Amino acid sequence: MKTLLTLIFILSSTLSYSAGTDSGGNSSSGGNSSSSNDPKGPSSNNNVDVNIEYHRAKKLIYKKEYAKGLKILENIEDEKPFGYKKADLYNYMGFASRKQKNPNYENAENYYLKALSLDGDHIGALEYLGELYFETNREDMARSLLDRLGIVAGESSNEYKELYNLLN
């Protein structure tokens, strides 16, 4: 019985340490995360911070603050996704790269292709890659993606309609 209690004590001590304390004994969970001050981005040990950073980046992108949003996404790119899909992260990275003041079409295309390599039916990446192909004078490739988008999302979807209207 003593052995069992000792084992339980050791396991509970180990688990509580790994659940959110740093080497100084301070809790890293809760509202006061240092991830926003860390140039490397959120810690891979704190999935909540990764999710918060991802959604913060999305909000910045929606507010057309593309460079700021992209920087955050780059900081969490290598982290394990929590509350989102990696394909979505790459889709937003592509969108922000393409929409910023000085668009980086090469990076944007690579991000969209990464998203599609993870999810070949990613509707956002299909639409936005089609827009990129149109913007870079590759209309045949854009039309090919329009056809694929029609199959995956349907011709009545907003994504299909937006790309269709751009091409016609």
Go through each PLM region and give its residues:
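Structural motif corresponding to the intra-repeat A-B loop/turn of tetratricopeptide repeats
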Residues: 63, 100-102, 136
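Conserved structural position within tetratricopeptide repeats
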Residues: 78-81, 113-117, 151
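Residue-level recognition of tetratricopeptide repeat
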Residues: 86, 122, 156-157
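Canonical tetratricopeptide repeat
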Residues: 92, 128, 162-166
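TPR/TPR-like (Sel1-like) alpha-helical repeat modules
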Residues: 133-156
